[in-house]
């Protein structure tokens, strides 16, 4: 052992390693190897070494005997040849190895865990996720619970140690419950914040998709316009080809001898037949009906009451307006004697319709056909599909000069290109003796009402009046027959004479509904020209009406809206506003009306709810007062309203 101490002292490499040196270096490995070699040589040295202790020699002799056995030597050699992986597999099962591989997380990942500001631990959250077990829920432990309850009901002295221990236990239990309630409250708050973040992200995604849908509908409108253009040119080419073919078949080839013997004029009879006759009615050849191939759906995804667009259409009070479909064509008329056609998809004016010599009081657009009734006692028919209009025209010209889209309603309306509507007029209907106050057409039948106290039925195919209905005569006939309707009634609200004699009408096949200044609604049969029912209820002139298969809705200057049952002739529902009703229309869900305010009055028939929609609500926040709404139209939740200052607003409803 002394020799070992001497050898240990003579190693020059056995020195302390500085802090700056590497932990694993060449010098350290060499020193460690020499130490291991020296220690092993001393342990397994000659047994006959006189310097070693006798007990040590005896122990080493036994070890040598054991190591010389072949079985032990083969085992040692087998372990030496075994890799560490095989050694681990021999000690652990496959499930244990898989579990350790999945549960092990490297330190690099643990360093990136963000610091949580939550004061509750993961285990507390796990405890809080379990519901509380009440006595009613522990049916499988009924005996144990009863047993504990019986023990707890044993009398206990208030000052005894058992009572103090029980109170401490109850306090600890309640504190634990309070802590769990705090954890659950924090979890609920975190879930609410997470849901709010998801909702905000969904709103952002919804806005992006809405913009994409708007662009798709714009491209769709442009493509549909191009298709209609091609179809029109195709129809014209086909007509020319048919005329040329029929002319070639009707004109046989003749020789010079046959031509010299012909006693006819220089034109054949077939050519004369092709020439238009002088008395041919203007409506003989009705143009083709161009129907929309697609329907816009963008407005269906907006919240009700959202403003889509606002335009200054005119410089004066709007007297009439109508549109064919959402984001389609709109026609507006005003006291400035102008009639303008608009593209609602782009907010641009297509052109101005010229022909009337006075203001247009009423109009209707249906499938690109427009009928206008004016104070000059004439009715004009127009084909809007013949308008020269390019939906992408504003993209190729200077916006400061040629752009006709009005984002700001205070801007002045820009005149559209001249001659864009030159091919639109079809023909004029002239028979009334006074201004046209109401009209409605469906198919080839048009009915108009005038201040001359008559209703006229027109055949649009022949372009002439086929029947005249005298309202005063019908009222007199009802009086002579002793009808309960009574004679013509002069209502108190029409004493000033400002109300139209024929305020509104609608036709469907042979049925006609007409509202007049005496507050009565008369239902006519156009086949007989007689009134078969009169609806009495309004106390003021009827200004608007509309009916469907079951109900008829009327609006009057007596400030009321009445819904009639056409099957019984009785009032189904009625409600009133603060001002007279000047315009009304309904769709499948809503009844909208202009009632002398800066908003449109909306009645939801499904929910039975009244609400307001219009600039009066949005501008009130800016301390502004918009003009009064005079006219309103609605189709499929897409509403257009015209005001006294010439501004037109487009809304979702």
From Swiss-Prot:
Primary gene name: mdv1
Family assignment from sequence similarity: Belongs to the WD repeat MDV1/CAF4 family.
Coiled coil: 207-251
Start and end residues of each stretch annotated as Disordered: 246-265
Keyword S-adenosyl-L-methionine among UniProt keywords: no
This protein's name: Mitochondrial division protein 1
Membrane topology: Peripheral membrane protein
Repeat found in the keyword field: yes
UniProt cross-references to CDD domains, sorted A to Z: Mdv1_N, WD40
GO-annotated biological processes: mitochondrial fission; peroxisome fission
Localization in the cell: Mitochondrion outer membrane
Source organism of this protein record: Neurospora crassa (strain ATCC 24698 / 74-OR23-1A / CBS 708.71 / DSM 1257 / FGSC 987)
Gene Ontology CC terms, in alphabetical order: mitochondrial outer membrane; mitochondrion; transferase complex
Signal peptide extent: none
